[in-house]
Each structure stands twice: as structure tokens, then as C-alpha cells.
């Protein structure tokens, strides 16, 4: 069966180190050249896919498809829409080997990213046609309407791949603070601190994993009355769009304590490693703590606590709480635009992504306000 691996920093095309580039190998450990050529195009050429996390997402989708082709005796370059439809239908009726739960429709559509590979192969004359067709469909109202919808001349219709399934985006769910406490009670000091960073700043797990020790500001001469929050610029973000987060001073102080105590012990356990020395959060054996590991730690704690939640739900909790707070602030600062402010804080490119939190507030305002009051003491 095919194997998926990733390059290290020793991989230096054109003299530049490129760790994290996917590499697909066959059972004899030979390069599967069409797939590897596409991965190199994504990583080195295409300007909109500059993130290793994006490369991994595409690679894992193609890897799953390649294994399906091998298991069924399908030639990757001879499949038609019937085979791709069968692959989709298997996910619609089956469960994930990883989670044991049914596949979310968004996951199924994400797996169909493999079709971008076929489009690329057609452009380079590797195959004659893509194994799917496109058709016009009416765009659903699951997403909040764009602020520029009055300029849309499409009549509410888009051309889409006919193999993708209808997906209604669910409302984000804020975690009640009681559930968060139960989860945190199952965690060690470092992991509780990471949860606090997510709750109090809205940072994603990859952004927390990407925090560097040098980014942690000194607070010796700072008073909480003067500067209750400290801005920190994030460089390792989704879509490589730098933004600011605003952790409270007390959180910075607790993180400093972790650096001097638990992190110092972990660092002594590591071999000399510049990545470990620069990363803020480390594993017990002194390696940088990765985003996937952060998510797994939280999921395992949720299971032990009997809570249904994901690490990303912490970001939803922050977003809903912050929007409720900003809306209250407009009574004192009328010129404040809560949605645009929240969009900037969260780093959303599309305002409609932020607007979904308005609907969340309408359905779960009490829980969100309680969470905000407990976290910040900001609400009366």
C-alpha cells in the first residue's frame, strides 16, 4: 500500500529549506511521480497554498484516495465519476476509522479535494479528462450573506462539482464554563495553560503551537490597571495572515511561571535543539508541542470528563463572548463596530464568517455571557 511521508529541513530545492512537503511512496518505497509533482506544485509554485498545514490537508485527502484505488484495483488515471461517487458514498454510509463516528459532510467534501489533483493532471497532459462534471446550483443560505451581495450578478447560483454533497454549516457551539472546568480538571498544568490561551485570546491550536518564547513579553514593570492585556503579534497563522492577539497580563504571568518551572525541566530533557529552545510549549521530553498533539490532549480530556467538545470550540466560546462584550461596549462607544472588530481579532478574511456568531448569540447568549463574566470579570 502507498505510504505518505513529509520532507525535513534537509530538503532544499533551489537552495531553500522546505520542511513539511508531502511525499507519496508506493509499496516498494518508490516515488509516485504524478502525486509528488502535484505536491511540489502546491508547496513551491502555487501562491495561495503557502502553509504546510494546507499541504498536509491536500496530501492526506489524496493519500486516502490512493489507498482506496489500490484496495479496489482501480488505476488512478483510469477512474471515472462512478468510482469517485462510490468513494463518496462509502463515506456517507460509513464511519471514520480514526474517530468511529460518521463522517461530517464537510469532511467528505474536503476529501474530494483530490479532484483538484485531476484538474492539474489534465492541464499537464497526464490524463485526458477529469473524473467529474460540474453544474449550476442555487447557493444555500447556510452561510451568512456577504456584505457585497448587492454586487453579485450570479442570481444566487454557482458552478460546483456535482459529486460534492449538500452541506449546511452548523452554528458554532460555545462550551459552558462549567464544562471547560471539568475538562481542565483532567489536565496537567501546561495543558490547562494552553486552554486558557485559547479561551482568552481565540487563538487556534496551530497558532498556540507556533508561539515562540521570544514572543512572551516581559511584564516586570507593567501594572494590570494600566495595561490589562498585552498585544502579541502572531506570524504562524491560518493562511499565513499575521494578526494580533491580546492575552491578559495575568495569563502572561502564569505562562512565565511555566517557562521557569515545567518548561525548564522539559528543556533539560531534550537534546540540544534550536526548535525546542525557541518554542514556548514543549512536550515532557523537550520537543516542540505540535498542533495535532494539542488537539488530541484536549479530546482525551473531554472524553475523561464526559464532555462533547473540540479544541476549536474554545475559539468559538471566545468569539461569542467577545462579540457580546463588544455589543455592550457600543452603548459607551457608539462608533465601535463589533463585527468588524471581532473579524480583526479572529483574523477572518471574509466578514460572513464572523457574522455567524450573531446567530450563535441569539441562541446561546446566557451561556456566552456567563463564560465572559467568568473569564474576564468584564460583565456586570
What are these regions (language model features)?
Residues 216-218, 307, 330-358, 363, ...:
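Short, polar N-cap/turn motifs at the start of nucleic acid-interacting alpha helices
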Residues 35-53, 62-148, 182:
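N-terminal core-binding DNA-recognition domain of tyrosine recombinases/integrases
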Residues 295-344:
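Short, basic (Lys/Arg/His-rich) helix/loop patches that form interaction surfaces
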Residues 210-254:
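Conserved tyrosine-mediated DNA breakage-rejoining catalytic core shared by Y-recombinases
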Residues 248-308, 322-325:
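Active-site/catalytic core of tyrosine-dependent DNA strand-transfer enzymes
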Residues 173-205, 338:
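Basic, Lys/Arg- and aromatic-enriched nucleic-acid-binding interface segment
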Residues 125-129, 198-225:
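Short, charged phosphate-coordinating catalytic segments
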